[in-house]
Regions:
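Bacterial N-terminal signal peptides that target proteins for export
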Residues: 4-18
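Hydrophobic alpha-helical membrane segments, chiefly transmembrane helices and signal peptide h-regions
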Residues: 18-26, 51-53, 57, 72, ...
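Predominantly polar beta-repeat domains that present long G/T/S/D/N-rich surfaces used to bind, process
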Residues: 37-51, 122-125, 133, 144-210
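C-terminal region of N-terminal signal peptides and the immediate post-cleavage residues
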Residues: 1-3, 11, 23-43
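N-terminal segments that cap or nucleate solenoid repeat domains
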Residues: 36-82, 207-210
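Feature marks extracellular polysaccharide-active and adherence modules
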Residues: 55, 63, 68, 74, ...
Length: 210
């Protein structure tokens, strides 16, 4: 083949590739966004009597409320409690969406959060989520997106088990025992020791300086 023939073949290949690679003018890449916790679908302030049941895909917000009765959260439901008092147990069932419990207290009520999909925040040690008073046990089990339990007064025992993506238990005053098992990674205390009236056991929580 002569040089001119080679050049024509090369030009033809380049033209074909150009036709294949040309994208339409409307081509765009869709943005990827994280799934956010739902906004409040029900907000209660002031006094309320009776058990509260939060359904899936609903978010209950208690803001400066006095709730006389238990609070139960179904799978895919969410709960935010700020500046409130709950007389009764607070129970979040496996598959719930998220929990914030800040500057609040329970009266004769345990707090149990199992199998949460989103973050769990029960006190933060700063003004973003101030100290809570919990008149009962705290159970945090199999939550998937991180757990923070910090600077709280807890009248019962604390159990943290099988939580994923970071567990912080920091600066709490716990009247009962502190038990930690199968959390991944093992819990940290953020450099602030917990005061524990009962026994300490499991993972890093067994150490007296934790």
């Amino acid at each position: 083949m002569n040089h001119l023939h080679h050049q024509r073949i090369r030009q033809g290949i380049l033209a074909t590739l150009a036709g294949v690679l040309v994208l339409p003018a409307t081509w765009a890449i869709a943005p990827v966004t994280a799934q956010a916790a739902p906004d409040c679908t029900q907000t209660i302030s002031g006094a309320h009597s009776g058990v509260l049941n939060v359904a899936g895909n609903q978010k209950l917000c208690l803001k400066n409320a006095v709730q006389d009765g238990a609070v139960n959260v179904a799978p895919d439901g969410a709960l935010s409690v700020v500046g409130s008092t709950v007389t009764g147990a607070v129970t979040l069932k496996s598959g719930y969406s998220s929990l914030d419990f800040c500057a609040s207290k329970t009266v004769r009520g345990a707090l149990s959060a199992t199998g949460g999909k989103g973050a769990v925040l029960v006190g933060s040690g700063d003004l973003s989520c101030p100290t809570n008073n919990i008149d009962g046990a705290v159970t945090l089990d199999a939550n998937q997106s991180g757990v923070t339990l910090a600077q709280n007064y807890i009248a019962g025992a604390v159990t943290s088990s099988a939580n994923l993506n970071g567990t912080t238990i920091s600066g709490n005053r716990i009247a009962g025992a502190l038990t930690c098992t199968t959390n991944v990674p093992a819990p940290t205390n953020g450099g602030v020791r917990n005061s524990v009236g009962g026994g300490r056991s499991g993972q890093t929580c067994a150490v007296n300086t934790f």
